[in-house]
């Protein structure tokens, strides 16, 4: 990460990460496809109505895993083995605790939260059942994500991908067996998701236990070290809050979609899942930017940091443009994978028509905060993202949307919020970058040799 051609290493790092994200999203996609094709639009709406709400609950802790990733990358690059080991064991312990807490919270408050979102009576019982079963698997979900974050910090993106391939195949097979064979509908797809997440969790923990070096996991050493937890929180909590608040605005958006009825909910579910594949593709580049920036920042290579950001911008815009245009032109064909009902497909196409082509803006919007988090600056990007993304969407939902009630007009809030956030994040990055340069006399001063992987 700290030497050699940047673009080649970015691609080799980000591509397995992209595939991992796509496979993880496939858990939800297979759920949606199976219930949409074999259980009908109401079951599809029931599963889809929980997506934004689930993200509101869990993304705080997933965001904190970014803090573990940044801290571990920094210690690994600097060859600080004891600090690396403490970070690993603190992160895994935190994952276990947060997973158990989220399981209890999700099971207890699922129905009440869905009622607050205005979930229609004809789907709320199935939505509640799906959400409660899904949350029972939170400990497995958290442990996998934190374990994978540690592996990514040391440059290993291939093994998490392999683990997801295995668990994804299990998930798909169980979905077909439980829904088609046993007619369990939404309960069946939720159970399949839990089992597959358990498999990926076991595989990543086994990998960490069997590895040699500073990031080896020992269950006997699992504990919370307050000093390292504080450092993880410094980067992770702002990232988690940002993601949680953004998904809260998406939950408000889901509530607005709910007002159009089950058909619109099903169309949004299919379209939103498709947009999710676009997001994980550009987000993998953001995560690569964060990891590369963190390692180069830790060894004082500030000029190389600039090149990392520029190459990430080129890569992100290119990927988003190709995928976004493909989704725009072939949206109807893709949506038929999720459902055969023409009205549902029409609603999905209405949403895709305004969100897919400008999706490159979303990739740009996330890159600058990713670079800043890699440098250890997380609070200000979080505040700016909340103001730009959440503020704009809430303003749109409560002020502009009532003037013209249509799905197309509602989802103009997406590109509008992306553009507003980009402007603020670019200005923030400029001033933080200037502050970093002023702190050193020679930005390209070579420090002692890095221990970073891929050097």
Enumerate the language-model features and the residues they cover.
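Short alpha-helical transmembrane segments in multi-pass integral membrane proteins
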Residues: 1-14, 72-137, 181-237, 293-358, ...
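Residue-level signal for short hydrophobic patches within transmembrane helices
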Residues: 3, 7-26, 30, 53-60, ...
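Transmembrane helical elements of multi-pass membrane transporters/channels
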Residues: 12-31, 133, 167, 196-200, ...
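Hydrophobic alpha-helical transmembrane segments in multi-pass membrane proteins
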Residues: 13, 17-25, 62, 94-103, ...
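Helix-terminus/linker motif at the lipid-water interface of multi-pass membrane proteins
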Residues: 26-45, 114-121, 177-184, 244-277, ...
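Small-residue-rich hydrophobic transmembrane alpha-helices
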Residues: 44-104, 141-160, 267-325, 329-331, ...
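Hydrophobic transmembrane alpha-helices of multi-pass small-molecule transporters
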Residues: 56-59, 171-175, 201-205, 277-280, ...
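Short runs within selected transmembrane alpha-helices of multi-pass transporters and secretion channels
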Residues: 65, 134-152, 160-168, 189-204, ...
């Amino acid at each position: 990460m700290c030497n050699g051609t940047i673009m080649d290493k970015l691609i080799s790092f980000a591509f397995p990460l992209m595939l991992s994200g796509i496979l993880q999203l496939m858990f939800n996609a297979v759920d949606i496809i199976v219930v949409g094709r074999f259980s009908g639009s109401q079951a599809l709406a029931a599963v889809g109505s929980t997506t934004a709400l689930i993200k509101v609950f869990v993304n705080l802790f997933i965001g904190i895993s970014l803090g573990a990733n940044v801290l571990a990358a920094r210690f690994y690059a600097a060859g600080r083995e004891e600090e690396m080991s403490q970070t690993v064991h603190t992160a895994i312990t935190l994952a276990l605790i947060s997973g158990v807490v989220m399981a209890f919270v999700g099971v207890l408050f699922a129905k009440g939260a869905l009622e607050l979102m205005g979930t229609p009576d004809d789907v709320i019982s199935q939505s509640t059942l799906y959400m409660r079963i899904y949350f029972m698997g939170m400990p497995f979900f958290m442990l996998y994500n934190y374990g994978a974050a540690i592996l990514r910090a040391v440059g290993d993106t291939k093994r998490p991908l392999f683990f997801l391939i295995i668990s994804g195949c299990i998930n798909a097979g169980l979905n077909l067996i439980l829904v088609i064979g046993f007619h369990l509908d939404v309960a069946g797809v939720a159970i399949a998701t839990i089992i597959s997440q358990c498999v990926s969790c076991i595989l990543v923990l086994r990998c960490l236990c069997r590895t040699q070096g500073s990031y080896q996991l020992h269950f006997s050493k699992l504990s919370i070290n307050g000093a390292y937890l504080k450092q993880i929180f410094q980067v992770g909590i702002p990232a988690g809050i940002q993601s949680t608040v953004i998904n809260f605005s998406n939950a408000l958006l889901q509530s607005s979609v709910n007002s159009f009825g089950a058909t619109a909910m099903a169309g949004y579910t299919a379209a939103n899942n498709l947009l999710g594949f676009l997001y994980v593709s550009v987000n993998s580049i953001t995560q690569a930017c964060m990891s590369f920036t963190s390692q180069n920042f830790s060894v004082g290579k500030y000029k190389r940091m600039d090149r990392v950001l520029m190459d990430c911008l080129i890569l992100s815009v290119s990927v988003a443009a190709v995928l976004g245009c493909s989704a725009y032109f072939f949206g109807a064909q893709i949506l038929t994978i999720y459902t055969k009902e023409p009205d549902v497909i029409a609603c999905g196409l209405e949403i895709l028509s305004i969100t897919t082509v400008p999706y490159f803006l979303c990739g740009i919007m996330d890159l600058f905060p990713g670079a800043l988090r890699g440098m250890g600056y997380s609070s200000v990007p979080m505040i700016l993202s909340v103001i730009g993304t959440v503020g704009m969407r809430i303003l749109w939902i409560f002020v502009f949307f009532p003037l013209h009630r249509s799905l197309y007009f509602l989802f103009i809030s997406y590109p509008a919020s992306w553009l507003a956030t980009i402007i603020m994040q670019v200005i923030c990055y400029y001033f933080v970058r200037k502050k970093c340069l002023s702190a050193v006399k020679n930005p390209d001063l070579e420090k002692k040799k890095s221990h970073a992987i891929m050097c």
